[in-house]
């Protein structure tokens, strides 16, 4: 048994927390929440100086242990070193840096003129207040970025944090338990391992903010549990009908194919903003398919599942689900369709043509299968109407030379974020939100948006003790009524 003691000299408070390496129970989870609430109520997390110190500790911990994390990501997901750093470790360091650079400015109280109606008050402040104890439930597909990146937002907001990491990404979760355990006392931040039962123990607790990343079905359960305590929730989901990519007949097909191939190879398609299906104009469909095949072959070879750099699916069950779905479309597989169940690697697979109403384009695939839907270019509005009628995706991508049309689509469709003539890079832009809508989520984070997600505004009017406003007091007369009507215009 390991005993942590955190001595808060400034507040005269000592908190003793016992943490064992045994499996968590309902009682031990409850005790962690109580200890974190006591720590938060001590006021220790409120100062900007403290928050920045913790963010720097977090950054140092990630950088000092990046080899351990990269190795764990390879073990869990088969990632090569470059992809592990680019998609997880490096990304999270960038995220922490953004919080460090902007926190003082974002956290500064806003000052507003109170207005004549509030005379003699002159000014009103809006304070950005932390929620308290935050619960972060992270997925397996980007187990560092989607846990530590959210933790950074929670820290920046002035909260404590409990991270329920995925039980599927075993090696990375074990590494995070070790790294965060060495970096922070558990009454401030802790990573918890375990299955659905442990997640439910966490959700049963009265925490102050929940941030969940995962599937819409589980998100409904999270919201149901959160509703019992009216706990505010942020959800980052993939969307039930996935993310569309639309290719017009005037698109640069070679460029589009190269980018789509890269993205579908990334993490073997296990990406919440990945392209779930492509809709390509029939006038250029065959040419696009040929370009896409060539792009995949150039990047990982004709048999991608044999390439050491190509990632694997997270579990044998995930592999089997992908293999089974591909088998249903065996007669329309024009590329790929092969894998190795022992390594859990399944090649990028093009399925063509697919009707827009078939099941494979009506759910999130979360793997390396890519169904291709064909439409007539002059009937693109019909395609857009069909997409709009379905559950909103986390991302939308369009490839075209017609920028005016592309902008119109991006301003009229419902989706989380997206790109014109590009894929996924909107995720990397500083200062912009990452979010979903409808079945792809609610709330937003990254940079200032993450700070906002983990804080709530509190408005405080500063009154005057030597002056008052008799106009608002009884008894009322015609003169007061006339003056009030002028003040309140």
Placement of each model-derived feature along the sequence:
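Low-complexity, intrinsically disordered or signal/transmembrane-proximal segments
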Residues: 5-6
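N-terminal Rossmann-like NAD(P)+-binding subdomain of aldehyde/semialdehyde dehydrogenases
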Residues: 13-124
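ALDH superfamily catalytic-core signature
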Residues: 23, 184, 217-356, 378-381, ...
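Conserved C-terminal structural/oligomerization subdomain of aldehyde/semialdehyde dehydrogenase
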Residues: 23, 46-50, 246, 346-489
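Structural signal for hydrophobic packing residues in well-ordered secondary-structure cores
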Residues: 40, 44, 59-62, 66, ...
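Residue-level signal for inorganic ion chemistry
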Residues: 51, 96, 158, 189, ...
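Rossmann-like NAD(P) dinucleotide-binding subdomain of oxidoreductase/dehydrogenase enzymes
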Residues: 115-255
């Amino acid at each position: 048994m390991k005993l942590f003691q955190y001595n808060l000299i400034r507040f005269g408070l000592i908190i003793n927390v016992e943490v064992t390496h045994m499996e968590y129970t309902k009682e031990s989870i409850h005790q962690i929440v109580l200890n974190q609430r006591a720590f938060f109520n001590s006021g220790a997390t409120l100062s900007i100086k403290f928050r920045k110190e913790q963010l720097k500790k977090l950054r140092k911990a990630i950088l000092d242990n990046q080899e351990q994390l990269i190795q764990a990501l390879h073990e869990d997901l088969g990632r090569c070193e470059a992809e592990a750093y680019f998609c997880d470790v490096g990304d999270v360091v960038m995220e922490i840096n953004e919080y460090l650079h902007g926190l003082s400015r974002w956290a500064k109280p806003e000052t507003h003129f109170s207005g004549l109606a509030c005379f003699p008050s002159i000014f009103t402040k809006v304070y950005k207040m932390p929620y308290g104890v935050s619960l972060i439930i992270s997925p397996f597909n980007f187990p560092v970025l989607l846990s530590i990146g959210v933790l950074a937002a929670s820290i920046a907001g002035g909260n404590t944090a409990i991270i329920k990491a995925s039980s599927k990404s075993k090696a990375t979760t074990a590494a995070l338990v070790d790294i965060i355990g060495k970096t922070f006392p558990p009454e401030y931040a802790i990573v918890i391992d375990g299955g659905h039962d442990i997640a439910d123990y966490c959700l049963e607790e009265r925490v102050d903010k929940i941030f969940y990343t995962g599937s819409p079905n589980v998100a409904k359960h999270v919201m149901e549990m959160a509703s019992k305590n009216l706990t505010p929730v942020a959800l980052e989901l993939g969307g039930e009908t996935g993310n569309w990519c639309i290719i017009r007949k005037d698109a640069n097909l070679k460029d589009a194919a190269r980018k789509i191939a890269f993205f579908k190879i990334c993490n073997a398609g296990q990406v919440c903003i990945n392209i779930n299906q492509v809709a390509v104009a029939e006038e250029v469909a065959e040419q696009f398919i040929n370009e896409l095949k060539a792009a995949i072959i150039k990047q990982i070879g004709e048999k991608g599942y044999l390439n050491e750099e190509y990632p694997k699916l997270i579990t044998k069950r995930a592999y089997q689900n992908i293999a089974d779905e591909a088998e249903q479309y065996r007669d329309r597989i024009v590329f790929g369709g092969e894998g190795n169940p022992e390594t859990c690697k399944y090649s990028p697979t093009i399925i063509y043509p697919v009707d827009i109403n078939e099941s494979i384009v009506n759910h999130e695939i979360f793997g390396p299968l890519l169904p291709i839907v064909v439409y007539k270019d002059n009937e693109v509005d019909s395609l857009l109407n069909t997409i709009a009628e379905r559950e909103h995706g986390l991302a939308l991508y369009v490839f075209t030379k017609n920028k005016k049309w592309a902008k119109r689509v991006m301003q009229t469709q419902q989706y989380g974020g997206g790109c014109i003539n590009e894929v996924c890079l909107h995720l990397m832009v500083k200062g912009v939100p990452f979010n979903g809508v409808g079945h792809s989520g609610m709330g937003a984070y990254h940079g200032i948006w993450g700070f906002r997600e983990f804080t709530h505004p509190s408005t405080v009017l500063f009154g005057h003790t030597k002056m008052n406003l008799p106009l608002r007091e009884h008894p009322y007369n015609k003169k007061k009524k006339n003056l009030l009507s002028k003040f309140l215009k």
